[in-house]
Amino acid sequence: MRIDFTPDPKLYPFQSRWFDSSQGRIHYIDEGDGPPILLCHGNPTWSFLYRDIVIALRDRFRCVAPDYLGFGLSERPEGFGYKIDEHARIVGEFVDYLGLDGYLTMGQDWGGPIGMSVAVERADRVRSVVLGNTWFWPTDVLTTKIFSRVMSSPPMQWAILQRNFFVEQLIPAGTERRPSAVVMEHYRAVQPSPAARLGVAEMPKQLLAARPLLERLGREVPAKLGAKPALFVWGMKDVAFRPGPSLPRMRATFPDHVVVELPKAKHFIQEDAPDEIAAAIIERFG
């Protein structure tokens, strides 16, 4: 399945590009010159989430933002499982296809584990790490386990697939101010049917099902990436990734770090504080 939607060029003033991965066609943007920065989104978003950050950075950085299979304008290939390790494998193919070297990797939400999984396999090509409201280790937080089990239940899977629950409910809940109607339409239009939303529905299951991958990342990220310079940009009003439980492990993993607190931002920090994030990246790595 392919997605028939053309983003508003006033909001998303980028050229769409395509990569034929081993499992399906990937949509991405590749804007600007300079050190490459790989921008990894989470659930249920796509490269559109990074639009304002890309606009702010593309004079200094080469901004590369893919849509995972099952997300954004990328294909929904029949038979693809949408597991986190599968997404990471495809993003790894994409990074190799572009020949990214000396790159910054940024991840938010599931973009953390996916980006880190790609990075540990290519540590010699990674320049630095930017993480925001994410994680890369097995979760033992009770509320996260409950969220995974509830969202994996038949009634909530029905709501995700049939009613587009993650887009309609969790994006507004995860932003400090509800996004405008036209912004919401850009998230809604790329998930137009139950068949298009299989990737969105799988990700909450992966909070528990991807534990073997997260256990491996919990070991390999410190060992292979821990010496890299890091930047943490954190939405302080996020109820999913509260700074108290999350930031101490981030700090311990990356001793050479800078923390930028985003006091008004909730989970979707790229919507709530794009200018602050871009400024922090420029100050730290520009």
Model regions: which residues?
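Acidic beta-to-alpha connecting loop that harbors the catalytic carboxylate
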Residues: 33, 236-239, 264-266
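Conserved hydrolase catalytic core segment
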Residues: 101-142
